[in-house]
Amino acid sequence: MNDDIIILLSVFCGIFFICFIICSSIALYLWKSKSRKRLVEQYTKEAKQAKKQILANGYKEISEAKMLFLKRSELEKNELDRVKEQLELRSNDLKRNQEIVESKSQRLDASLLDLEKRKFLLDKKEEYLIKVLEDASSLTKSQAKELLIKQVKNKSEKELISILKNAELQAHSNSKMIANNIIISAMERIKVELTSQRTTNIVKLPSDDLKGRIIGKDGRNMKAFKQIGGVDIVIDETPNTVVVSSFNPIRREIATRTLEQLIIDGRIQPVKIENELKKQEQELEYIIQETGLSTIKELNINDIDIELVKLIGKLKFRTSYGQNVLAHSIEVAKLSGAIASELGLDVEKAIRAGLLHDIGKAIDFEKQGSHVVLGAEIAKKYNEDPIVINCIESHHEDKEKESEIAAIVAIADSISASRPGARYNAIDEFILRMTEIEKIGNSIPGVAKTYALQSGRQIRLIVDPLVASDLDLAMILEKMKEEIKNKVIIPGEITITVIRERKETDVLK
């Protein structure tokens, strides 16, 4: 009995559990169905709202596009109306002009008819008068015409000869006046400093006490300047002053700069002098280049070889008849440019030719040949314009002038050279004499350098110790004496000194 009850309870519990599971599943299903329904409703609601928003935005964009289209259409319509109105105005103007032209044409036609009638009447009257004249003069028309032409011709020839003579005199007077005006106008526009070259430089001293140090023990410092620098150091009673003397302006400038630097440094001795001379020589090369660059910049000259620029700078240290060649060349360049401007010619080419016309003087003391020939060679070497080359070749009438610019440069050169005080022949002759002495010395075998000092009355021959021995010094001295007697005229006594010095330098580490 108890077992049956247990079995029944077990069966009942199983059935209850199954029913519970089924009910739970049904409840869960119903709950999920409701949740899904709510989600569907929510998504549907959001989709409807999005649809409404999209439609609203679409309507708004369509409305804006429509408004924009209407405004654009209205503007285009207004523009078309304006163009149409302008075309109508132009059309009306053309119609009025056409009417005016037609009216003028009608008046011209009427005038032509009237002129033809008058011409016909005049021809008739002319025939009548000719007939009357022929009857009165017993000459035909052709005979009277020939007589009249002959009389007029004779009278015209006399008047023409008189007119031509007067015109020739007037043209000659005007051409001379115009030429003078051109040159005067060019000279008025040019301002160039007058520079006369000296053969000495003055060095100011802080005190006279330095003179003894400059002289050195037994005069060795002054000897060093003579032997190495090729200049004379002149010390006299003038207070606080030392004079550097040399006909060669480049050597004089190097020595002056050297002495000034040594005075600042305070150490004045032969070795220091030699080193400083070499240093100042290098610095002067830089100054020469800078001078050339500043010159072409001043004259606004472009596209020029740097080596040619250096030669231009070198002219600063060259003189001709006492006139500084660079200053003279700049003056000729400016005068040439001004005259070319007055005549309507190429100003830049005239300035360039004027500057380079004496470029041969930058090397004529180093090479054989006239400055004209050397200058033309330099210009050809650096590919200058043929007109510029001809200006160099013809400014002293060595060659025929091939252009107006060549004539202008020659005129400007003459103006610059002929100014009062521009040139001094005595100085140039002195420099030529000194140059000739140095050339003679340098031509002797074994001589490395020659220095002409004190107007040529002292000559220093520096011998190359590797080429000439002590035994050769007497022979070199005799050779120099003989050459000087035959080729150079110098009044008074001449002292010739031959110096052979050899130095050995080594560095001990």
Swiss-Prot record:
<feature type="domain" description="HD">
    <location>
        <begin position="325"/>
        <end position="418"/>
    </location>
</feature>
<dbReference type="InterPro" id="IPR017705">
    <property type="entry name" value="Ribonuclease_Y"/>
</dbReference>
<dbReference type="InterPro" id="IPR036612">
    <property type="entry name" value="KH_dom_type_1_sf"/>
</dbReference>
<dbReference type="GO" id="GO:0006402">
    <property type="term" value="P:mRNA catabolic process"/>
</dbReference>
<dbReference type="InterPro" id="IPR003607">
    <property type="entry name" value="HD/PDEase_dom"/>
</dbReference>
<dbReference type="Pfam" id="PF01966">
    <property type="entry name" value="HD"/>
</dbReference>
<keyword id="KW-1003">Cell membrane</keyword>
<dbReference type="InterPro" id="IPR004088">
    <property type="entry name" value="KH_dom_type_1"/>
</dbReference>
<protein>
    <recommendedName>
        <fullName>Ribonuclease Y</fullName>
        <ecNumber>3.1.-.-</ecNumber>
    </recommendedName>
</protein>
<dbReference type="InterPro" id="IPR051094">
    <property type="entry name" value="Diverse_Catalytic_Enzymes"/>
</dbReference>
<keyword id="KW-0255">Endonuclease</keyword>
<comment type="function">
    <text>Endoribonuclease that initiates mRNA decay.</text>
</comment>
<keyword id="KW-0694">RNA-binding</keyword>
<dbReference type="GO" id="GO:0003723">
    <property type="term" value="F:RNA binding"/>
</dbReference>
<keyword id="KW-0540">Nuclease</keyword>
<comment type="similarity">
    <text>Belongs to the RNase Y family.</text>
</comment>
<dbReference type="GO" id="GO:0005886">
    <property type="term" value="C:plasma membrane"/>
</dbReference>
<dbReference type="InterPro" id="IPR006674">
    <property type="entry name" value="HD_domain"/>
</dbReference>
<dbReference type="GO" id="GO:0004521">
    <property type="term" value="F:RNA endonuclease activity"/>
</dbReference>
<dbReference type="InterPro" id="IPR022711">
    <property type="entry name" value="RNase_Y_N"/>
</dbReference>
<keyword id="KW-0378">Hydrolase</keyword>
<dbReference type="Pfam" id="PF00013">
    <property type="entry name" value="KH_1"/>
</dbReference>
<feature type="transmembrane region" description="Helical">
    <location>
        <begin position="5"/>
        <end position="25"/>
    </location>
</feature>
<dbReference type="Pfam" id="PF12072">
    <property type="entry name" value="RNase_Y_N"/>
</dbReference>
<feature type="domain" description="KH">
    <location>
        <begin position="199"/>
        <end position="259"/>
    </location>
</feature>
<dbReference type="InterPro" id="IPR004087">
    <property type="entry name" value="KH_dom"/>
</dbReference>
<keyword id="KW-0812">Transmembrane</keyword>
<dbReference type="InterPro" id="IPR006675">
    <property type="entry name" value="HDIG_dom"/>
</dbReference>
<keyword id="KW-0472">Membrane</keyword>
<keyword id="KW-1133">Transmembrane helix</keyword>
